[in-house]
Amino acid sequence: MSPENQSSVSEFLLLGLPIRPEQQAVFFALFLGMYLTTVLGNLLIMLLIQLDSHLHTPMYFFLSHLALTDISFSSVTVPKMLMNMQTQHLAVFYKGCISQTYFFIFFADLDSFLITSMAYDRYVAICHPLHYATIMTQSQCVMLVAGSWVIACACALLHTLLLAQLSFCADHIIPHYFCDLGALLKLSCSDTSLNQLAIFTAALTAIMLPFLCILVSYGHIGVTILQIPSTKGICKALSTCGSHLSVVTIYYRTIIGLYFLPPSSNTNDKNIIASVIYTAVTPMLNPFIYSLRNKDIKGALRKLLSRSGAVAHACNLNTLGG
């Protein structure tokens, strides 16, 4: 980081959500509830997958990593937003802002790659069921997840290093509730053409290419399903990928609306609302989508509750006996 960058600005001001002061308490309670639901729901998914041996399959291996990523992704922005709403302290230090940008990009890209890996898993399961065990081996799954982490880290690091080279002069007010990369580039008084090129390249790598892979996977899945002779087989195939398809639809609809619509149709308030859906709502909904539409998850939850009930009953008997 150059001395010019260090002396130009030491902190930024986050304006937060476009809400009136009298609405702060309501929105604070709402987002706190959403964040707790996100954390607890995804932790429950991870716990169920860990405890139930029937869920030790490639699909749930990817799902457990997606749950961890959703917790982390939401934790990058929501706690800071809640703290700002509660204390009205809107300042964030320069290094803290750069760090938040890094982790936001990292977990956003990781989410995209993991969802793509899950689509590939569903493609193999439905289109090549006889070879599923030999293709989706444990080492293959680990490689897909590890590759997702490495590529996401590289993309985030590229953006962060380029961002750290920019100078920020007089204006240090960010009209957002977190340190959004696009908002930071607008504040810079340096040439951001290299940053814009990096954003375009990363969008192809981390958004469009995974989305294309998902479309191709589901295209093959659709063709295979149409060739299944029995209605029961079709329903089973659809139930296998229904939850994942719902997550893909919510995730990429928000991404496309936020980053790929023409600027003229996107006001700042609309961008903030889309970001809220992207960072707070979607990670909260994922556990419900996978649990409500998944017999394996619901079965594992019933087992966990029955075990908990049995343990509680045994503890009560011991207490009474003592």
Swiss-Prot record:
Q: Where in the cell is it found?
A: Cell membrane
Gene Ontology CC? plasma membrane
Q: Which GO terms describe its molecular function?
A: G protein-coupled receptor activity; olfactory receptor activity
Q: Which residues are glycosylated?
A: N5
Which keywords has UniProt assigned to this entry? Cell membrane, Disulfide bond, G-protein coupled receptor, Glycoprotein, Membrane, Olfaction, Receptor, Sensory transduction, Transducer, Transmembrane, Transmembrane helix
Q: What does the record say about its membrane topology? A: Multi-pass membrane protein
Query: Does Glycoprotein count among this protein's keywords?
Result: yes
Q: Which residues lie on this side of the membrane: Cytoplasmic?
A: 50-57, 121-139, 220-236, 293-322
User: Which regions span the lipid bilayer?
Assistant: 26-49, 58-79, 101-120, 140-158, 197-219, 237-259, 273-292
For biological process, the GO terms are: signal transduction
Top-level taxon: Eukaryota
Per the record, ranges on the Extracellular side are 1-25, 80-100, 159-196, 260-272
- PANTHER family, alphabetized: OLFACTORY RECEPTOR
- Its job: Odorant receptor.
Query: What's this protein's family per the entry?
Result: Belongs to the G-protein coupled receptor 1 family.
Q: What is this protein called?
A: Olfactory receptor 1J1
Q: Which organism is it from?
A: Homo sapiens
Recall the taxonomic lineage recorded for the source organism.
Answer: Eukaryota, Metazoa, Chordata, Craniata, Vertebrata
